């Protein structure tokens, strides 16, 4: 356990609550002390939904510590059963309340006797896994519970649909542009003549989970959530799944070809989506011709750093490198549990790979390599602001501006257009900045400081500061840093104009 003011992936119970609150008519009860119950506020603030978050906190207070939690937890479950009449109630502790080592499964068994709803305890180790791993596990647990229940009741529907159909697994609340991606995936599958069987967990009903085996295959757009469920369904019903994320022109084409192979394995009448892929790539997606335009060629060779969850960071790295000719100096992910897969995906597309969930390491790396742009999470956006480096947000965790009301998918062919816009608009055009400084429009009185840590031992003279102001803004920060680095190496505490020129000569040598 470590103290941090920023975490890329939250504690396990947040993942469980995200899955539970994504389903329709499912209620979650969180057995937690005050302070752990921030999920309701977070979801209400970020997700642009009209419904209340279906999560109740069963607070661990001094009375509970004195008498035990059983009565309070059981009462909360039975009360919510009567008030809300949900199909399912999910009970989850937090890492704090887990310290009490209570037999919560016994509480669930007791509450089930007096409830019309199904009641389950989230089967998650709160000390070993993070938010994303817990979400993946909880989704698989809920699916398994209802598949087993349908088997016992002999009403499991195993007859495949007449037309090709798919389940989309892993779209859930607080995901990065998940709602928009879901719409784009539905449109893509519809274009391919494939029906949507179920979308889970977002907007799905637990009573329909027994219909999952009717689909011809499962589509898992994000590795972080849904993969365990797809593997379970493959093992149980021999259902194939596609886990290639359709992000970018190349990977969207690869995903469609995988779907084509699966459908052809079911039917005698072979189909080909080559014509569709060609048409979409050349005429519908603007990204392919844009990448060959003079605007995009101006970005060729520019340095970028990519950091985010494994799915988005790996896809973005390949898009920048393969499709846009941008030099990815470092690609990284905070999904430390998926490090091997990530390294395999970005191999050959970047110079350096960073696997860490410590934001200070990411900040230090960005300050060291000085990229022209960053593509990361909300945290990298903060780092970019401090270093005056533009940042495009491509992965959760994100803030309110990345829950847009307008249609902004990152997957499919429309997603390629969004990504092309994001990439192009993220890079600062040096001449534009320079002209703004010459003709006005920016406050250029203060020298821009680029550095994560302030160096108080170095002092710039007024003459050297005036000299620094004459340098164009798009290279000024770099020259300032190089001069300060030279001064430290030579034990100089006061930076004069002469030191600036000496530093320049040393760099050119």
From Swiss-Prot:
Its EC number is 1.3.7.7. Keywords: 4Fe-4S, ATP-binding, Chlorophyll biosynthesis, Chloroplast, Iron, Iron-sulfur, Metal-binding, Nucleotide-binding, Oxidoreductase, Photosynthesis, Plastid. Its cofactor is [4Fe-4S] cluster. InterPro entries: ChlB/BchB/BchZ (IPR050152), LI-POR_suB-like_C (IPR013580), Nase/OxRdtase_comp1 (IPR000510), P-CP_red_C (IPR042298), Protochl_reductB (IPR005969), Protochlorophyllide_Rdtase (IPR016209). One of its GO terms (biological process) is photosynthesis, dark reaction. Binds 1 [4Fe-4S] cluster per heterodimer. The cluster is bound at the heterodimer interface by residues from both subunits. SUPFAM superfamilies: Helical backbone' metal receptor (SSF53807). The active site is at 295 (proton donor). [4Fe-4S] cluster binds at residue 36. It catalyses: chlorophyllide a + oxidized 2[4Fe-4S]-[ferredoxin] + 2 ADP + 2 phosphate = protochlorophyllide a + reduced 2[4Fe-4S]-[ferredoxin] + 2 ATP + 2 H2O. GO terms for cellular component: chloroplast. Substrate binds at residues 430-431. GO terms for molecular function: 4 iron, 4 sulfur cluster binding; ATP binding; metal ion binding; oxidoreductase activity, acting on iron-sulfur proteins as donors; oxidoreductase activity, acting on the CH-CH group of donors, iron-sulfur protein as acceptor. Pathway: Porphyrin-containing compound metabolism; chlorophyll biosynthesis (light-independent). It is found in: Plastid, Chloroplast. The keyword Iron-sulfur applies. It comes from the Eukaryota. The keyword DNA-binding does not apply. PANTHER family: LIGHT-INDEPENDENT PROTOCHLOROPHYLLIDE REDUCTASE SUBUNIT B. Protochlorophyllide reductase is composed of three subunits; ChlL, ChlN and ChlB. Forms a heterotetramer of two ChlB and two ChlN subunits. Belongs to the ChlB/BchB/BchZ family. Component of the dark-operative protochlorophyllide reductase (DPOR) that uses Mg-ATP and reduced ferredoxin to reduce ring D of protochlorophyllide (Pchlide) to form chlorophyllide a (Chlide). This reaction is light-independent. The NB-protein (ChlN-ChlB) is the catalytic component of the complex. This is Light-independent protochlorophyllide reductase subunit B. It comes from Mesostigma viride. The gene is chlB.
């Amino acid at each position: 356990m470590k103290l941090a003011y920023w975490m890329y992936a939250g504690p396990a119970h947040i993942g469980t609550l995200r899955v539970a609150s994504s389903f329709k008519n499912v209620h979650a009860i969180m057995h937690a002390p005050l302070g752990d119950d921030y999920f309701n506020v977070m979801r209400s603030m970020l997700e642009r939904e009209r419904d209340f978050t279906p999560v109740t906190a069963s607070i661990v207070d001094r009375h509970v510590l004195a008498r035990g939690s059983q009565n309070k937890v059981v009462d909360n479950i039975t009360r919510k059963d009567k008030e809300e009449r949900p199909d399912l109630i999910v009970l989850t502790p937090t890492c704090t309340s887990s310290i009490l080592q209570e037999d919560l499964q016994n509480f669930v068994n007791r509450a089930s006797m007096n409830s019309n709803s199904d009641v389950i305890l989230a089967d998650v180790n709160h000390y070993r896994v993070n938010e994303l791993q817990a979400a993946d596990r909880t989704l698989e647990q809920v699916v398994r519970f209802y598949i087993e229940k349908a088997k016992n009741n002999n009403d499991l529907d195993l007859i495949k649909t007449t037309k090709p159909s798919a389940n989309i697994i892993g779209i859930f609340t607080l995901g990065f542009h998940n709602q928009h991606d879901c719409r784009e995936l539905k449109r893509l599958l519809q274009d391919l003549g494939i029906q949507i069987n179920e979308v889970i967990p977002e907007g799905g009903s637990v009573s329909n989970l027994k219909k999952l085996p009717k689909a011809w295959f499962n589509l898992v757009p994000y590795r972080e959530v849904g993969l365990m469920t797809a593997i379970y369904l493959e093992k149980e019903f021999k259902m194939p799944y596609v886990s290639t994320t359709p992000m970018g022109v190349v990977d969207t084409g690869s995903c469609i070809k995988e779907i084509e192979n699966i459908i052809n394995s079911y039917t005698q009448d072979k189909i080909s989506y080559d014509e569709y892929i060609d048409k979409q790539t050349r005429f519908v997606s603007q990204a392919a011709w844009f990448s060959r335009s003079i605007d995009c060629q101006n970005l060729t060779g520019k340095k970028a750093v990519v950091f985010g969850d494994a799915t988005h960071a790996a896809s973005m790295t390949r898009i920048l490198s393969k499709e846009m000719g941008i030099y990815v100096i470092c690609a990284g992910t905070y999904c430390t549990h998926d490090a091997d897969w990530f390294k395999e995906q970005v191999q050959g597309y970047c110079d350096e790979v960073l696997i860490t969930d410590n934001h200070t390491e990411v900040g230090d790396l960005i300050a060291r390599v000085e990229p022209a742009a960053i593509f990361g999470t909300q945290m990298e956006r903060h780092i970019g602001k401090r270093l005056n480096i533009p940042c495009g947000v491509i992965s959760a965790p994100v803030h309110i501006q990345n829950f847009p009301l307008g249609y902004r998918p990152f997957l499919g062919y429309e997603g390629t257009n969004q990504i092309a816009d994001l990439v192009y608009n993220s890079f600062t055009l040096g001449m534009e900045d320079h002209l703004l400084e010459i003709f006005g429009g920016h406050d250029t009185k203060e020298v821009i400081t680029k550095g994560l840590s302030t160096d108080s031992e170095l002092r710039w003279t007024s003459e050297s500061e005036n000299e620094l102001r004459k340098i164009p803004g798009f290279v000024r920060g770099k020259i300032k840093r190089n001069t300060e680095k030279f001064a430290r190496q030579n034990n100089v505490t006061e930076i004069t104009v002469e030191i600036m020129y000496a530093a320049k000569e040393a760099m050119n040598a």
